[in-house]
Curated annotation (Swiss-Prot):
Species of origin: Blochmanniella pennsylvanica (strain BPEN)
Domain GMPS ATP-PPase: 208-400
Protein name: GMP synthase [glutamine-hydrolyzing]
InterPro entries for this protein: Class_I_gatase-like, GATASE, GMP_synth_C, GMP_synth_GATase, GMP_synthase, GMPS_ATP_PPase_dom, NAD/GMP_synthase, Rossmann-like_a/b/a_fold
Function: Catalyzes the synthesis of GMP from XMP.
Organism domain of life: Bacteria
């Protein structure tokens, strides 16, 4: 069966929560994608959504250059749900009134009182208000504009504490709007509201499930590739490993993996993957040692974006050289996932900037007769891991912390040198070993060390020590789109720090990063 026959389209107005919204929809078993606000009619028809959700955004409908909803969207005859800015722009374009407020802005947790019945909200509430006797919701808001007059044929079904419009509905046309964010966990009944819209109003069925996803990827790959030969860029990370196992199931031995040792890897981690593949996966893997080639290309390069581009370019060169030595290869497979696409600014709102480039987004261009194959391009990391478990990958490998494509190059600030990589590998090993020993590794989403290109004074015995500084980074996250720094105990951090400065003689100082995403990214570069 096609696991994405029922689907929701999210029109993205630049909200920081858009990707979280997509995950919430998929958690309900319904496929979702986001698109730019200026999507064409033909693209929407091709996607064939059962319903549309309009995201929030940082803009004001009062400003002339703000993004808007294409008029044809309202003529599709399918349910539409506007969130925050999405509700405001829908109201504005349909004849309602939106005004900017100063004293009555709302940012954070607040309450909404339900005024009237609606299929959209019936029986969904957190408590009964003691004063009014009405049902109420605990919600999360973040807005400076408000809808002061709803469009014709709309009903106000909920208000905030200032009696401003918080929910509106046009039941006949299945158009709905809320001023708050149902996709964030602070809105306690947010999941119920999304589920009501998606399953009851849009009538979507829950078919986006792991077993169905695997079957669809396998069948689509077989149809697309046929009898052609495929080469896969294999890093040993969960994304490329799952891609390899899916290709193995789909096309057998029609593909070969190429693993490039660029000197920027955490080798002790890859040894485990290599052994697992040899014993369980029956994969054909070519191992290439190209360490010096990468280090030579990175000499004198300090800018992180340039480092990413150079690593991607050299990877491309090595792959192209190897592919030319292989017979009849027609496809290049990559373990690109949805978050790679998002952060690279591909297929997103034109109001979003590229956060960072990804070496595995966009493919290789030097060989004109080879096509790009990205089986897991539309999957989030947690979906990839679930598929991995279903394919027989052990839990500790499937949930191994992510390792960036450019490797240690973006965990070394400034110029990359082999000696820095060697230091960082030893430090990182200590940090991860202690996390596992204290049973913290599986509770943390990602942890690693960062090499800071500065010296700091220390004391070792009676000797003055002037050595390098290391930063430790550990975060907790669900989807890697947002993250909070992990609260590690002082005793644990003290133990790790002592081991590092005593066992790695090149290091004199250790610091701990307490920055969340946003505003910081998880990786330092």
């Amino acid at each position: 069966m096609k696991c994405n026959n029922h689907r929701i389209l999210v029109i993205d107005f630049g909200s920081q929560y858009t990707q979280l919204l997509l995950r919430r929809i998929r958690e309900l078993g319904v496929y979702s994608e986001s698109c730019s606000w200026n999507i064409s009619k033909s693209q929407v028809y091709a996607f064939n959504p059962n319903g549309i959700i309009l995201s929030g955004g940082p803009y004001s409908v009062i400003d002339n250059d703000s993004p808007y909803i294409p008029e044809f969207v309202f003529q599709l005859g399918i349910p539409i749900f506007g969130i925050c800015y999405g509700m405001q722009i829908m109201s504005f374009q349909l004849g309602g009134r939106v005004e900017r407020v100063i004293a009555q802005r709302e940012f954070g947790c607040t309450q909404v009182t339900i005024l009237s019945k609606s299929v959209f909200i019936n029986d969904i509430y957190d408590y009964v208000d003691d004063v009014t006797g009405r049902f109420a919701l605990d919600v999360w808001m973040s807005h400076g504009d408000v809808v002061t007059t709803v469009p014709k044929d709309f009903t106000v079904i909920g208000v905030n504490k200032y009696r401003q419009v918080a929910m509106m509905a046009n039941e006949d046309r299945h158009l709905y709007g809320v001023q708050f964010h149902p996709e964030v966990t602070h809105t306690k009944k947010g999941k119920s509201i999304l589920e009501r819209f998606i399953t009851c109003i849009c009538r979507c069925k829950s078919s986006w499930k792991i077993a169905n996803i695997i079957d669809d990827i396998v069948m689509d790959t077989r149809v697309k590739v046929g009898n052609d030969k495929v080469v896969l860029g294999f890093s040993g990370g969960i994304d490329s490993l799952v891609t390899a196992l899916l290709l193995r199931r789909a096309i057998g031995h029609q593909f070969i993996c190429i693993y490039i040792d660029n000197g920027l890897l955490s080798n002790y981690e890859f040894d485990r993957i290599k052994n697992f593949c040899a014993l369980n996966c029956n994969l054909d893997i070519i191992y290439l040692s190209q360490e010096q080639r990468f280090f030579n290309a990175l000499i004198g390069v300090n800018d992180p974006e340039k480092k990413r581009k150079i690593i991607g370019r050299v990877f491309t060169e090595v792959f192209e050289e190897q592919i030319r030595n292989l017979v009849a290869v027609k496809w290049l497979a990559q373990g690109t996932i949805y978050s790679d696409v998002i952060e690279s600014g591909v297929s997103l709102s034109s109001f979003k900037n590229v956060i960072k480039s990804h070496h595995n987004v966009g493919g290789f261009c030097g060989i004109t007769d080879i096509q790009l194959l990205e089986p897991i391009r539309n999957l989030f990391k947690d979906e990839v891991r679930s598929i991995g478990l279903d394919l027989g990958i052990p839990y500790d490998i499937a949930y191994r912390h992510p390792f960036p494509g450019p490797g240690l190059a973006i965990r070394i600030l400034g110029e990359v040198k082999k000696e820095y990589c060697d230091i960082l590998r030893r430090v990182d090993f200590i940090f991860i070993e202690e996390l596992k020993r204290e049973h913290l590794y599986s509770k943390i989403s990602q942890a690693f060390a960062v090499f800071l290109p500065t010296h700091s004074v220390g004391i070792q015995g009676d000797q003055r020590k002037y050595k390098w500084v290391i930063a430790l980074r550990a975060v907790e996250t669900i989807d890697f789109m947002t993250a909070h720094w992990a609260y590690l105990s002082y005793d644990f951090l003290n133990k790790v720090s002592n081991r590092i400065v005593n066992e790695v003689e090149e290091v004199s100082r250790v610091v701990y990063d307490i920055s969340s995403k946003p505003p910081a990214t998880i990786e330092w570069e």
